[in-house]
Amino acid sequence: MNKIALYCRPGFEKECAAEITDKAGQKEIYGFARVKDNSGYVLFECYQHEDADRLIREIPFRELIFARQMLVVGELLRDLSPEDRISPIIGMLQGVMERAGELRVEVPDTNESKELLKFCRKFTVPLRNAMRQEKILLIRENANRPVIHVFFIAPGCCYVGYSYSNNNSPFYMGIPRLKFPSDAPSRSTLKLEEAFHVFIPYDEWEERLASGLYAVDLGACPGGWTYQLVKRSMMVHAVDNGPMSESLMDTGQVKHHKVDGFKFVPSTKNIYWLVCDMVEKPAKVTQLMADWLVNGWCREAIFNLKLPMKKRYEEVAHNLQKMHLQLKENGINAQIQAKHLYHDREEITVHVRRIWSAYAANRDDY
């Protein structure tokens, strides 16, 4: 198996390919990307057979922006017989994988694959049983063992491979399944909820998404992102010249500042979260976020960067590198992650965590 399959949003295959080619080159691993527009996935074929496994071990999945999932695969299995689809799939894995912890039978995230997804759900049970009989898969799921992926790109055609559970997306098809809350002011609320799922480990939610924390939402109107903060019992400074949702204001947890988000300066030093979803040039938003972090006005930030029409990966990489250098020059130790989330469209979501000593929020300062 000398290929890497990367799932992505349809229409962003070129960005995904540019990114994996860049990351592989940094590891001195070389190959070429196979891209089909609007397919929802990219293949990166390594020149050296063992390099594919090395890549999915050494490239931190959390550092990939445009990939929803990353796995090693073999050659495409074509024209699987309806009488026996299982044997060829088992054959691809024998001698390659044993005692895996989970099976995922998946498809690209395209409209054309919706019917195929129904088949995958039915096919999973007999395939899982067969893999357990062959000792390719453990009897019980184990989150510490590799994941087997069977990736159908068309009826009877699939890639078979694996990912490592400590360096992959834990979500089926790389997509968190979130339900839109009926009382939220806008669908944008799902972007921030997904960002919490992707960027913050569940075992740290009680500390980092705790009730009583203070937050600022720049460009808050009508309140889609503020809603997520209020739902977690935070106190929110909502900054926007436009109107906020009355239901959010009625909670008593929101203070509305009718100010331009680029001009707002917090009057207290107890802000933990800064969130921002403003339609502006990526460089301008990146600079604003860097200023907040350098000034120590927040501890963590989640913000969106709108993507240009061309050279999206290059533009994103440039802005993130610029932020990294600015923080470093100011002696700020920070973790930076970025992801093209499922609920993002022509934008990416960035998370920055400033590493400094913890402090207790003081309600009297609100």
From Swiss-Prot:
Transmembrane segments: none annotated. InterPro entries: RlmM_FDX, RlmM_THUMP-like, RNA_MeTrfase_FtsJ_dom, rRNA_MeTrfase_M, SAM-dependent_MTases_sf. It comes from the Bacteria. The keyword Methyltransferase applies. It is found in: Cytoplasm. The keyword DNA damage does not apply. The active site is at residue 306. Belongs to the class I-like SAM-binding methyltransferase superfamily. RNA methyltransferase RlmE family. RlmM subfamily. This is Ribosomal RNA large subunit methyltransferase M. The gene is rlmM.
